Regions:
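Ser/Thr-rich, Proline-interspersed low-complexity disordered segments
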Residues: 9-67, 241-244
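Beta-propeller blade termini
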Residues: 81-90, 137-147, 187-197, 201
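Core segments of small alpha/beta cavity-forming domains
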Residues: 89, 95, 107, 138-139, ...
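Acidic/hydrophobic-patterned starts of short beta strands in beta-sheet-rich repeat architectures
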Residues: 92-102, 146-159, 197-207
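Structural motif
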Residues: 107-113, 163-169, 211-218
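Short solvent-exposed beta->alpha transition segments
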Residues: 115, 119-124, 166, 172, ...
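Low-complexity, intrinsically disordered terminal/linker segments enriched in charged
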Residues: 155, 192-195, 203-206, 234-258, ...
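Exposed beta-sheet edge and beta->alpha loop/turn motif
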Residues: 190, 205-221, 304-363
Length: 363
């Protein structure tokens, strides 16, 4: 046993004393490095745009004074004492001209208008065959503005004659002279209004229709001329309360729509006949006009009559507020009207829709 052990030792020891190879040295890979990103991305800010304010135009006081003095001297030389003067750009050249009205002596006197552009004198003349010319009375109703939205400034001269006749003359610079663009005369006056919400004024010529009523002919600019586009009845005076005439079938129909336009729904309901009122209670009937903004009636004519019953036709424009949009609808309406102890009353109607549009800029 001992021998075996020694042999084992002898055998083992040389092995233990043999030289060992050097260990391989491993160079550790370097740890990766990162450049930290900014928490918020940055960019070169765009320069804030700056604007150079346009200087406000200034008037040369000396030039203005000289212009006024020259104008006064020219008027004095012409022997004219103006009723009023305006200083406006009437020909679109960027410079103002003098616009004035004065009264020419005569029987009766005649209203006259002129434009003084530097040394150039322009008379604004009515048609030769006009009975009243620009007017018979001293007035100072004068406007310079783009009345029909055509991009040009028109000169509007208002006048009056006899008891209630209203006159309107519209002039325009045509490149060489001031031409008469349009002329209107109504025995109950003339007025401007944007009737259809298109930002261009229509011309309403008013005529007496009797019984506190006027009939209006509405004229609209078509790009070249004014033309008749609509007619309607309205009150001569705006004072309330109004008397609803029912002495004729036509008056009953007119009164009904004027009451609706006045928002006098009880008054309008009272113009319905007994059968109509029996068919629909007042509260329920009035609810049907909850969205109505305005109503206009024109072209009213009695077609025929048989005993105490008449047939009346009319055209009606109704304006309704539908979800914040004003919608205009044109109707043909035919009414059956019956004579009662209290006058003519509306019994039943048939309607036919002719047109519908949105009044985008309803006044």
């Amino acid at each position: 046993m001992r021998y075996l052990v020694l042999v084992s030792i002898v055998v083992v020891l040389p092995t233990a004393c043999a030289p060992q190879p050097a260990p391989t040295v491993v160079t550790p890979a370097p740890s990766p490095t990162f450049t930290p990103l900014p928490a918020v991305p940055t960019s070169t800010p765009a320069p804030v745009p700056t604007t150079t304010p346009t200087p406000a135009p200034t008037l040369d006081s000396a030039a203005v004074a000289a212009n006024i003095a020259a104008g006064e001297a020219r008027l004095e030389a012409q022997g004219i004492k103006p009723l009023c003067l305006r200083w406006d750009d009437t020909d679109g050249d960027g410079e103002a001209e003098w616009v004035g009205l004065y009264l020419q002596p005569g029987e009766p006197p005649q209203l006259a208008a002129f434009i003084l552009d530097g040394d150039a004198w322009h008379d604004l003349r009515p048609l030769e065959d006009e009975k009243y010319g620009l007017g018979e009375y001293p007035t100072c109703e004068l406007q310079v503005r783009d009345v029909n939205a055509d991009g040009r400034a028109e000169i509007l001269v208002w006048g009056h004659a006899e008891a209630s006749i209203g006159l309107l003359h519209i002039f325009i610079w045509d490149g060489e002279s001031y031409a008469l663009l349009a002329f209107f005369e109504g025995d109950a006056g003339v007025r401007l209004e944007d009737a259809d919400g298109d930002l261009a004024d229509e011309i309403s010529v008013r005529y007496e229709a009797g019984d506190d009523l006027v009939w209006e002919a509405v004229h609209t600019w078509d790009g070249a001329n004014y033309g008749w586009t609509w007619e309607r009845y309205t009150w001569f005076y705006l004072d309330r309360p109004h008397v609803y005439r029912t002495d004729t079938p036509e008056h009953a129909v007119i009164s009904f729509y004027l009451a609706v336009d006045d928002r006098d729904l009880p008054g309008a309901y009272g113009l319905l006949g007994p059968e109509s009122q029996a068919a629909t209670p007042a509260d329920e009937w009035m609810t049907g006009f909850a969205t109505t903004v305005a109503a206009e009636v024109g072209a009213v004519h009695e077609l025929g009559r048989s005993g105490d019953t008449a047939t009346v036709i009319a055209q009606v424009r109704a304006y309704d507020n539908l979800d914040g949009r004003v919608i205009a609808t044109l109707w043909d309406v035919e009414w059956t009207v019956a004579l009662t102890a209290g006058g003519w009353r509306l019994e039943s109607a048939t309607t036919d829709e002719l047109d519908r549009w949105e009044a985008v800029y309803y006044p």
